[in-house]
Amino acid sequence: MNQTLEEVVSLARQCGCGHRHYDIPIEQMVVGREAFARLVAYLRHKRYERVAIVADDHTFAAVERSLCDQLENGSIRYTVCLVQPDENGDVIADERSIVQVLLETPDDVDVLIAVGAGTIHDITRFSSYKMRIPFISVPTAPSVDGFTSMGAPLIIRGVKKTIQAQAPIAVFAHTGVLCQSPKEMIAAGFGDMVAKYTSLADWQFAHWMADEPYCPFVHQLTEQSLQTCVDHIDDIAAGGEQGIRVLMDALLQSGIAMLLMGQSYSASGAEHHLSHYWEMEFLRQKKRQVLHGAKVGVSTPIIIEHYQRVFWPLLNELEKRPKSMDEATWERLKANTASIRELLESLPSPERIRTMLAKVGGAIAPEQLGIDPQLVERSLREAHRLRLNRFTMLYFLNELIFVE
């Protein structure tokens, strides 16, 4: 991170935005080759004698020798729950995976350890919350910014829902393990960071148009983590330890920013809603899943194109109020027109986003992910309904301007 955890907490206390800043429950956050040794020391300090590792076949294989040797040398007893994939070979954060973890975790376990990427963390986060025990994060790839999140995006009866659960009490990310993660997962992590361009724009817009809680400090933290990745794109693309550490630190800082606000506005906007919509459609069609970061990376330039194509004509024709919009909202839109123009102009071009994604080895078009143009168009009309309490420019356009 650009600041230490202690510095972030201190700066948050000095913030004058007027909104509540939540306590950060994370006691330690270690990114480096000493991570697993520090994990064992932390477990002993907390007097956790029995732990349960939650992983899948691939993530457990990535750490089995290095992590388990450390646990055994530290006299830490552990069990392992390997979450089983579905019929397509995907590990899904759904009811089946959660029930498996609940059934296989011994009653006397002190803490769960999530060993994996986003999906394993979501399963562990919710399961530990329901079991009323803490969990520790051990990322095996720098692929998402949700490691430190309280929210668990789950598939419940085929529908994507984000359920507030709990954040990890500590994070131990071994850079040696992270550097060995598949290139597509590193590209996905960069994609999740690139998505902050539109999520931050949506958040600012929601503050202006719907009085959503907004904090300049949290915005700055998120923007800073994004810019650091952009500035070090060559290092990240090279896949060396320096670049991977930069990416991991940025993902963690973005997650800490969400924790401070108690919600994910800073990191998740319309681009995430498109991604969730595509994910649900793939589940319905029983197609193999695509990495979350790959989807939001691809959806970000799509959202930018959509906003610039649709919003500019609207801002140029403010004489007549649409029948679907009340007078107060119309007046607010007119009052904020200059700011909205500036916001749209500040977004990078879709071509620049795609160039950056390609540089780190990521997909740049939905077709590369098996997403056809019809699904993209449908998601632009309907994806905002997955989270109607999240005010975005996409929500505004679909619900208040182009009402079907």
Swiss-Prot record:
PANTHER family cross-referenced by the UniProt entry: GLYCEROL DEHYDROGENASE, GLYCEROL DEHYDROGENASE 1
Source organism of this protein record: Geobacillus stearothermophilus (Bacillus stearothermophilus)
UniProt subunit comment: Homodimer.
Necessary cofactors: Ni(2+)
Subcellular location: Cytoplasm
Binding positions for NAD(+) per the UniProt entry: 56, 118-122, 140-143, 149
Residues that coordinate or bind substrate: 145, 192, 276
Catalytic reaction(s) noted: sn-glycerol 1-phosphate + NAD(+) = dihydroxyacetone phosphate + NADH + H(+); sn-glycerol 1-phosphate + NADP(+) = dihydroxyacetone phosphate + NADPH + H(+)
Biological process per Gene Ontology, one example term: phospholipid biosynthetic process
Keywords from the named record: Cytoplasm, Lipid biosynthesis, Lipid metabolism, Metal-binding, NAD, NADP, Nickel, Oxidoreductase, Phospholipid biosynthesis, Phospholipid metabolism
Protein name: Glycerol-1-phosphate dehydrogenase [NAD(P)+]
Function: Catalyzes the NAD(P)H-dependent reduction of dihydroxyacetonephosphate (DHAP or glycerone phosphate) to glycerol 1-phosphate (G1P). The G1P thus generated is probably used for the synthesis of phosphoglycerolipids in Gram-positive bacterial species.
Annotated positions binding Ni(2+): 192, 272, 292
Details of cofactor binding: Binds 1 nickel ion per subunit.
